[in-house]
Amino acid sequence: IIDKKIDLPELSFDKNGWVTSARWKGMDEPLFTEGLADFMVVHFNDMDRWSQGDIYMHMDEVQRIEKFNEITRMEWAKPKSKAKVRETPYSWIVSQDMEHPRVKNMNRQVEIFKEVPRAKVNIFFDRISSIAPEVFYAKFPFPQDCRQPVATNGGIPYELYKEQIPNSCKDFFVIDSWVKYEAEDGARIWSSGDVPIVSFGGHHMGMRLQDAPKKENELYGMLYNNLWVVNFCVDSPGEMNFEFDLTYREGKQSVEQLTDMADSYYIPMSIVNTPEALEDPVVHKYLNTPQRLTSGY
């Protein structure tokens, strides 16, 4: 037996024991920064969903921002208890119960891997029924020098905010599965098989952005939207679970490599009791093929 020695990542924690950064050997900056998996709800005081569209479309920038500030309110989840840390042979799992007036039984968890620069995030909550307009977000902050995110839509990569059709939407983006940030020390990749809609620098409601926001390094995944009238139910209560992966890569990575990596992280392992007969080619073909959520948007 050979005793394998590895360079463990440097971790930091807040006063409640939640992890605020993780940096592996060879990285100048951490994989993520303080605020990982913070949960936020945008509330709307105006129950008329259609009025939001009128404000967005027909007011000038100053009027629009003033009006949205008047009718909206942001509310962040708070720690319900100290975070708990459990060590496995290959990782640390940090788990913390959270509380927010709009959900019950909320928990966030991150698994920090020892040998590879990777963090697996899980957010769980039980949404309380309500028809009031509201939007749920999860925050993923990266180092400040992480700029110019790249993503794919329909398998086609492009630089967000730059390589877009003029006057197309820059408030939020529908992605296939991953977002890549380039930095001086390497790339950081955010991926999810559950959340295909993201924004940057904050929530996207009423923004009408023309350029990239100041805090482009802060990614927000939209978990639930009770405001939109298209493709979202007006009220979907009950338990919801979302998974994300944050990884670091040195050197250039092709779109195919990033997609394969992201797909491999959120495909559950399938165990098949193989009979004596040959495997079915159709079953084998689709067994490990992720079904992308973006097809419904």
Predicted segments, located by residue:
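C-terminal (or distal) subdomains of carbohydrate-active enzymes
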Residues: 1-297
